[in-house]
From Swiss-Prot:
Compartments where located: Virion; Host cell membrane; Host endosome membrane; Host Golgi apparatus membrane
Keywords: Host cell membrane, Host endosome, Host Golgi apparatus, Host membrane, Host nucleus, Membrane, Transmembrane, Transmembrane helix, Virion
Subunit record text: Interacts with gK (via N-terminus); this interaction plays a role in the coordinate transport of UL20 and gK to the trans-Golgi network (TGN), and is required for their cell surface expression. Interacts with gB. Interacts with host STING1; this interaction inhibits host interferon-beta promoter activation.
Keyword 4Fe-4S: no
UniProt cross-references to InterPro entries, sorted A to Z: Herpes_UL20
Gene: 39
Family from the record: Belongs to the alphaherpesvirinae UL20 family.
Name of the protein described by the UniProt record: Protein UL20 homolog
Gene Ontology BP terms: viral life cycle
């Protein structure tokens, strides 16, 4: 049952008016005004509980759909990156390997993609274990470990891509036409639909390398950026 509506005495109104208004000349006007009665009644109700008590437990409150947690754009991008972007880039790296027998970028992309999934598994296990133990989702040491994995993955791929695109001359000769390559389509596709043309494996390699590098950079910034901002601006750390 809801508690009865409290009647506020004149002395209580005078006391509350001092709390609300710091100017003594306006206190009398505020106390005599009937428009402020709902405000006074609400403040008194808050002092001992009731339907408007701000200290109610979460079990007794109703959270609107606007304030409920939901998938963010980063969550959707992370899923698309893990399921689509990285595997497709690795396929293009494999096409370049089949055309030139240069397996450096293909090996690096494959291993770093596996490392990305390994990091995801570690994060899920840490969150599950901490929540089961009634702790915060991620401790400081766990966030540090995940951050090292993210930064290392980005640095290794950027170094490998830089060597393949700018130091190894095969990509340049393939793009300019000085070095011919085989058709990159698999034999199974060629048997069903004979194909004698296709995009250059070097062009696909450049596109895939740029997309994969951007994916790594976005992943690093989205993981490191919020934590650095909270540490610098709020002098604290986040636990997820």
């Amino acid at each position: 049952m809801n508690p009865p509506q409290a009647r506020v005495s004149e002395q209580t109104k005078d006391l509350l008016s001092v709390m609300v208004n710091q100017h003594p000349e306006e206190d009398a006007k505020v106390c005599k005004s009937s428009d402020n009665s709902p405000l006074y009644n609400t403040m008194v109700m808050l002092s001992y509980g009731g339907d408007t008590d701000l200290l109610l437990s979460s079990a007794c409150t109703r959270t609107s759909t606007v304030n409920r947690s939901a998938f963010t754009q980063h969550s959707v991008f992370y899923i698309i990156s893990t399921v689509l972007i990285q595997p497709i880039c690795c396929i293009f790296f494999f096409f370049y390997y089949k055309a030139t027998r240069c397996m450096l970028l293909f090996t690096a992309g494959l291993l770093l993609t596996i490392l990305h999934h390994f990091r995801l598994i570690i994060m899920l296990l840490c969150v599950y274990r901490n929540i089961r133990s009634d702790l915060l989702p991620l401790s400081t040491s766990q966030q540090l470990l995940l951050g090292i994995i993210v930064v290392t993955r980005t640095m290794l791929f950027c170094i490998t891509a830089y060597y393949t695109l700018f130091i190894d001359t095969r990509v340049f000769f393939l793009i300019t036409g000085h070095l011919q390559s085989e058709v990159i389509f698999p034999d199974s596709v060629s048997k069903i639909l004979p194909v004698s043309w296709g995009p250059s494996p070097a062009v696909l390699l450049v596109m895939a390398a740029v997309i994969y590098a951007m994916d790594c950079l976005v992943d690093t910034v989205s993981f490191i950026g919020p934590r650095v901002w909270v540490r610098v601006m709020l002098k604290t750390s986040i636990s997820f």
